[in-house]
């Protein structure tokens, strides 16, 4: 039978092999991509359930299809858990991704052509915060704020100045490569000063907000968006939160029928599982460990004069390092580290001088290694091995030594037990 899972290997050997190879790759690699994590078997089980068969346009109790009693329960569980976890009045769990969550928020709050103030991509923002190649930059008139050239941290006085000069209808706070605490209260004060909406994209830090290790944007933002993966450790998807009932209605209309048709109820079920996991007291320990591991790794780079640690440290799950004193660019650093089974991504740094295809920096994140059970000791050692590989990137003997030690680490901390 085609639908017999046990027959999958025989039915589609080529696809089975690709998936199997990816599982082996994940097991044998140290994953330091800040936006990646390791979900539980329960999350995967929910996402692989019969819910993938069901179409359910609309919202719980207001569907355009019959036979939705069960998926109504599933989606309602996800909604209530999201509201509880983040202490929000309203939640929409249907966005297929963080980008679509952002698109829905824009659609609900502003009109095409309106001015929006968002974080510059090179300073740590996201494509959907106004990059010219993104729908956001094509649909709305984005102006950007950056970081202070000396501290490489947000300069709220300068952001206020830009807001007063440009009079945006919406201000977007949040980042994809910023390692410091974001003061959402100050952002709301800036938004109020120019009569703008405040939207917070907390995709990268949602898990840390949930665990209590980063201030929550919910009391200050008119709308908060996030992904459900990254530090939240759920399936790949989006989520929108607000405390404003009128805005919530606009958000719901923007998601469906504005941007999407049928929701992915199997993914929503997996979101519900991840949200329940995040409500468990153990998740607070997980959030704390993510930050401890990131700070331990960052300290190793900070103590080496051949590397520049952006903003001189980290308060969250990630940090950026300028590698150009030891290797030509971030792209080459990424490739060298991949040779020794350490996966991360090249990344632009503030006031970047190289192209985004090369970059001066790399971005390093600890959610995935923390999920595997690695701690401060392992994090320090991984950073030391990274430095060893980068400084000796033309020495195959040393790269082999590093690769072997990485294998010992990954063997000691399996991706999944049994």
From Swiss-Prot:
Pathways per UniProt: One-carbon metabolism; tetrahydrofolate interconversion; Amino-acid biosynthesis; glycine biosynthesis; glycine from L-serine: step 1/1
Sites annotated Plays an important role in substrate specificity: 229
Keyword vocabulary terms for this entry: Amino-acid biosynthesis, Cytoplasm, One-carbon metabolism, Pyridoxal phosphate, Transferase
GO cellular component, as recorded: cytosol
Family (UniProt): Belongs to the SHMT family.
Oligomer and partners: Homodimer.
UniProt protein name: Serine hydroxymethyltransferase
UniProt organism field: Streptococcus agalactiae serotype III (strain NEM316)
């Amino acid at each position: 039978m085609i639908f017999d899972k046990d027959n999958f290997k025989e039915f589609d050997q080529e696809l089975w092999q690709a998936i199997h190879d990816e599982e082996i790759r994940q097991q044998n690699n140290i994953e330091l991509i800040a936006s990646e994590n390791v979900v539980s078997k329960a999350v995967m089980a929910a996402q692989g359930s019969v819910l993938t068969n069901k179409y359910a346009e609309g919202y719980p109790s207001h569907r355009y299809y019959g036979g939705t009693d069960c998926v109504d329960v599933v989606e309602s569980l996800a909604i209530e858990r999201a509201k509880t976890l983040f202490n929000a009045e309203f939640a929409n769990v249907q966005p297929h991704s963080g980008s679509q969550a952002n698109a829905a928020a824009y659609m609900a709050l502003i009109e095409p052509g309106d001015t929006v103030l968002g974080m510059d991509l090179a300073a740590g923002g996201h494509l959907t915060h106004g990059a010219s190649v993104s729908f956001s930059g094509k649909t709305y008139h984005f102006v950007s704020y950056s970081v202070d050239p000396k501290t490489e941290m947000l300069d709220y006085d300068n952001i206020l100045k830009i807001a007063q000069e440009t009079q945006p209808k919406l201000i977007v706070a949040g980042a994809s490569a910023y390692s410091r605490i974001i003061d959402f209260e100050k952002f709301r004060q800036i938004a109020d000063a120019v009569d703008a909406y405040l939207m917070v994209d907390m995709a990268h830090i949602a898990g840390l907000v949930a665990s209590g290790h980063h201030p929550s944007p919910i009391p200050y933002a008119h709308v908060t968006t996030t992904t459900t993966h990254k530090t939240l450790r759920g399936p790949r998807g989006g989520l929108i939160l607000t405390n404003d009932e009128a805005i919530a209605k606009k958000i719901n209309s923007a998601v469906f029928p504005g941007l999407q048709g049928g929701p992915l109820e199997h993914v929503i079920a997996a979101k519900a599982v991840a949200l329940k996991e995040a409500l468990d007291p153990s998740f607070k320990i997980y959030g704390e460990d993510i930050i401890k591991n990131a700070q331990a790794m960052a300290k190793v780079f900070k103590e080496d004069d051949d590397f520049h640690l952006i903003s001189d440290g980290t308060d969250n799950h990630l940090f950026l390092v300028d590698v150009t004193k030891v290797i030509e660019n971030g792209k080459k650093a990424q490739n060298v580290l991949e040779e020794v089974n350490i996966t991360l991504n090249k990344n632009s740094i503030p006031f970047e001088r190289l192209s985004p295809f090369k970059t001066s920096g790399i971005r390093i994140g600890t959610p995935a290694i923390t999920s595997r059970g690695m701690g401060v000791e392992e994090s320090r050692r991984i950073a030391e091995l990274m430095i060893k590989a980068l400084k000796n990137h033309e020495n195959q003997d040393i790269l082999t030594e590093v690769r072997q030690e990485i294998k010992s680490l990954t063997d000691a901390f399996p991706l999944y037990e049994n």
